[in-house]
């Protein structure tokens, strides 16, 4: 069970703080069922309600600093997505995002970064699907790493680059 004040990752909402654990007084909602009341830290004014009894499938703790540093050092060995069919690739991106796994977000970022370079060299634009999933994966990854490493989100990318180049 998560505790009030704890940082968690919740689905596509990114890093959230557990604001409360309570029942809801809303019509049509089981008044006996407990919910985590989450506040996404990068979506001001948003609130997410997650039933406590289903949180195992949709929430997890934010990486520790040690786990974040290990993940960053493992980035060069994380494989690319090797699907060439654009429709299947979008399904794979979607599946990777749903896993709520930082390594899967890195796979998306690495794959799209290389696809983007190839398209630019060929005089073509980045696809809308690639742009969308690149942004989503970066937002989720950098948001979580910023919390884990206790640094501003806008410094995460340069930190990763420095650590990999060591």
Each predicted region: which residue ranges?
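Charge/polar-rich, low-complexity and marginally structured segments
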Residues: 53-166
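A positional/architectural concept
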Residues: 1-57
């Amino acid at each position: 069970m998560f505790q009030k004040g704890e940082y968690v990752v919740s689905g596509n909402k990114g890093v959230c703080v557990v604001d409360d654990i309570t029942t809801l007084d809303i019509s049509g909602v089981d008044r006996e069922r407990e919910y985590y009341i989450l506040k996404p830290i990068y979506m001001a004014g948003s609130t997410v309600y997650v039933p406590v009894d289903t949180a195992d499938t949709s929430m997890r703790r934010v990486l520790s600093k040690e786990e974040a540093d290990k993940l960053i050092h493992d980035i060069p060995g994380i494989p690319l997505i090797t699907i060439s069919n654009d429709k299947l690739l979008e399904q794979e991106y979607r599946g990777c995002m749903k896993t709520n796994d930082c390594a899967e977000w890195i796979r998306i970022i690495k794959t799209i970064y290389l696809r983007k370079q190839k398209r630019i060299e060929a005089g073509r634009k980045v696809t809308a699907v690639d742009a969308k999933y690149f942004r989503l994966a970066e937002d989720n990854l950098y948001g979580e790493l910023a919390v884990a490493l206790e640094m501003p989100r806008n410094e995460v990318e340069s930190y990763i680059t420095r650590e990999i180049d060591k």
